[in-house]
C-alpha cells in the first residue's frame, strides 16, 4: 500500500479520513504534531496555515509515496497556492472531504482549487458515511506506477 501524506487546513477532516481509511471508529482528536504510521503521515493544519512551517511539510513529504491535498467541500477559500506541491516532487491527489455538507457546484469548485494546487486525481469523500473511501483505498493498493504528470 502506498503511504499518503495528508496536507490541509485545520478542521478539514484529515484525521477523520485517516481513521476511516484504517477502519477505525471516528472520534475527534486534534493533531498537535506530524503523526507517522505505515499507511499515512497526518499533518496538523497549522503547518499549512503558518508558512514558516512549510519546511517541515517539505521534509516530511520525502517519506510519502503520494501527497494528498485535503480540503472540505464547504470551504470558502483555498489555502493552497497554484502549484503548491511542485517542490515536493511527489505524485499528488486531491481529497474533497465532507461531501455530505455541500452542493455539487461547491464540490466542483473545491476540486478545481485542488487541481490548480497540483492534484492529478480528485476523490470526493465523506468520512461520516464512508463514501468515496473505497476508491481511495483502490488507488493506494494499486500496483500501477505513479506518475508526476497529468
From Swiss-Prot:
GO terms for molecular function: ATP binding; GTP binding. Pfam families: PduV-EutP (PF10662). The keyword Nucleotide-binding applies. Keywords: Bacterial microcompartment, GTP-binding, Nucleotide-binding. GO terms for biological process: biogenic amine metabolic process; propanediol catabolic process. It is found in: Bacterial microcompartment. Induction: BMC production is induced by growth on 1,2-PD vitamin B12 medium. GO terms for cellular component: propanediol degradation polyhedral organelle. Pathway: Polyol metabolism; 1,2-propanediol degradation. Its main location: other. GTP binds at residues 8-15. Bacterial microcompartments (BMC) 100-200 nm in cross section are formed during aerobic growth on minimal 1,2-PD-B12 or anaerobic growth on 1,2-PD-tetrathionate medium, but not during aerobic growth on glucose, anerobic growth on glucose or pyruvate-tetrathionate. BMCs can constitute up to 10% of total cell protein. Interacts with PduU, probably via the PduU beta-barrel which is predicted by modeling to be on the exterior of the BMC. Belongs to the EutP/PduV family. May play a role in the spatial distribution of the bacterial microcompartment (BMC) dedicated to 1,2-PD degradation, perhaps being involved in cytoskeleton dynamics. This subunit is directly targeted to the BMC. Might bind GTP. PANTHER family: PROTEIN YOEF. This is Propanediol utilization protein PduV. The gene is pduV.
Amino acid at each position: 500500500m502506498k503511504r499518503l501524506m495528508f496536507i490541509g487546513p485545520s478542521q478539514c477532516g484529515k484525521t477523520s479520513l485517516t481513521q476511516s481509511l484504517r477502519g477505525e471508529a471516528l472520534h475527534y482528536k486534534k493533531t498537535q504534531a506530524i503523526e507517522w504510521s505505515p499507511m499515512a503521515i497526518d499533518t496538523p493544519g497549522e503547518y499549512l496555515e503558518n508558512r514558516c512551517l512549510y519546511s517541515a511539510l517539505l521534509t516530511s513529504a520525502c517519506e510519502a509515496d503520494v501527497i494528498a491535498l485535503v480540503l472540505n467541500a464547504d470551504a470558502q477559500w483555498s489555502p493552497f497556492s497554484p502549484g503548491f506541491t511542485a517542490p515536493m516532487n511527489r505524485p499528488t491527489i486531491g481529497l474533497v472531504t465532507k461531501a455530505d455538507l455541500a452542493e455539487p457546484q461547491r464540490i466542483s469548485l473545491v476540486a478545481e482549487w485542488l487541481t490548480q494546487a497540483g492534484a492529478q486525481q480528485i476523490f470526493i469523500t465523506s468520512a461520516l458515511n464512508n463514501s468515496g473511501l473505497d476508491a481511495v483505498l483502490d488507488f493506494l493498493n494499486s500496483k500501477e506506477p505513479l506518475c508526476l504528470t497529468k
